[in-house]
Amino acid sequence: MPNVQKTVVKKSHKFVIDCTAPAGKIVDVAAFEKYLHDRIKVDNKVSNLGSNVVISKDKSKIIINTTIPFSKRYLKYLTKKFLKFKQIRDFLRVVATTKNTYELRYFNIGDSESQE
C-alpha cells in the first residue's frame, strides 16, 4: 500500500473593524492599530504575532488577517478595552454588522429622549 501524505490546508480568517463613523473625530485609527498589535495574544503570549496574525490599516478600517484559529469575540473585547482606555466608551459602542465585521457606532441618545 503506498504511503499517502495528507496536506493540511490552513484556513485564513479576515476580520474588519470599521471606524468610519467616528473616524476623524475621536478615534485615532493608528493608535488603535498599535494597541491591537501590542495586546493580541498568540499562544498565550503578547506581541507574538509573527506571520500568523497580520494587522493592517486602510484609511478608517482595521483589517486583521489570521492563519490560526482566532475569535471574533476577542477582537470585540480588545476594542471595548481600547475605548475604555481612551475614555470614549460612554459615546461609542461596538456592533457586529456582518459575520466578520465590527463597526463603531455612536449611542442613540436622541431616541431615548424623544420617548420620554
From Swiss-Prot:
GO biological process: cytoplasmic translation
Domain of life: Eukaryota
Keyword Ribosomal protein listed: yes
Key word Ribonucleoprotein present: yes
GO molecular function, a single term: structural constituent of ribosome
Keywords: Ribonucleoprotein, Ribosomal protein
Gene Ontology CC: ribonucleoprotein complex; ribosome
Gene3D superfamilies: 3.30.1360.210
InterPro entries according to UniProt: Ribosomal_eL22, Ribosomal_eL22_sf
Similarity-based family: Belongs to the eukaryotic ribosomal protein eL22 family.
The protein's name: Large ribosomal subunit protein eL22B
